[in-house]
Amino acid sequence: MLDLVIVNVPYMFINNPPLAGAVLKSCVEEQGFNAKSMDYNIDFVNHPVATNDIVLWLQKEDSPPQAENYINFKNWVKECAKEILSQQARWIGISIFTKDSQLACEEFVVALKDLDPNCQIVLGGMGQEDRRNQWGARWIDLMWNSGIVDSVIAREAEKEVVELLKHDKKEFVQALQLTVEELDNLPVPNFDDYNLDLYGDLDPYSTEETISMPITGSKGCVRKCTFCNVASFWPKYRQRNGHNIGKEIIDLYNKYGINYFKFTDSLINGSLKDFRLMNEYITDRMPNTISYKGQFICRPARHMPDRDYDLMRSAGCKLVQIGMESGSEAVRDHMGKKFTNSDIERTTYSLADQKIRQQWFIFVGYPTETDADFEETL
């Protein structure tokens, strides 16, 4: 008998296997429990029920699908629920990655409880905290107050899911942020339950590799930009040790044979010390073998000398996504970005010299932006 089944539900992109299931599986198995990860999102996107109107509805609930397609979707969910229940797990954990998984989660929960009212369901994931516009309340509060789920873990579940299995408590847990030491001591994620051949990086800005492996080096952000909600989820920025991250990358490469890694971090160079340590660790042990991409913040030359860009290239950095946001320093200052146009120029050329591709995020229509500010961006 399994202790835990970790379920991913639609809708998510399929550029990499879900990280939550792999992380939680390794955490509970390290403590002597057994778990299985089941990705029904990858099954969905390869199934005839994934019609355009169903996908749109999952992402935008005020766009109802055709009745026949909705019935087919519900029947598919019911078959998935039967398969989940056949695992005979003590707990069924459903991971809600973004708000795009909320509607599917509701369908899965109803189907599971219809088939077995005594099954124990715990919800988790950052997507459960998004608000429902028509109710003005967090979605997870609506689910909990309805009484249809047995437990909820809000925020970081790596420790709390182990406590759930130890004590079988049916409660709403507002998890505390993990400390840096706790992040460094997490086991390497276990992707054994996923068919990795089914995943592919469909991002048009990706490198030539097709299958990517997700990895988390930090949680939170060193900035608190006015338009961003990252600080509301992770108030304190925490960074794993760079050697720890580099070792995990190499361990995953050696185990699964995938050499392309995608960071889930808000930024990969928040801690320059650990960013250097990671790049040095990979360069020293496996130069020009690994490829990775991630989100990046523009920094002045005094913070990131040329050697840092050399290390990025030798460690395998192929693409960075940068929140440049605006060509106007006045707009960026109001946002809290804290870099100059000279910093942008220097960062751009330094990355280009190392043949590291760049994808910029540009913010048009920021509240303080004037026509002159917009012209600076152009």
Where are these regions (language model features)?
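Acidic, low-complexity intrinsically disordered segments
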Residues: 2-257
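Alpha-helix N-cap/loop-to-helix initiation residues
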Residues: 13-17, 101-102, 271, 301-302, ...
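Short amphipathic alpha-helical segments and helix-helix/interface helices
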Residues: 25, 106-110, 140-144, 161, ...
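Short, function-defining helix-loop hinge/capping sites that tune catalysis or transport
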Residues: 47, 133, 158, 273, ...
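Short low-complexity, flexible loop/linker segments enriched in glycine and/or proline
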Residues: 50-54, 169, 278, 335-337, ...
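Residues in well-ordered alpha-helical elements
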Residues: 159, 184, 243, 261, ...
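Radical SAM [4Fe-4S] cluster-binding motif and immediate context
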Residues: 189-366
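Catalytic cores of alpha/beta
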Residues: 308, 368-378
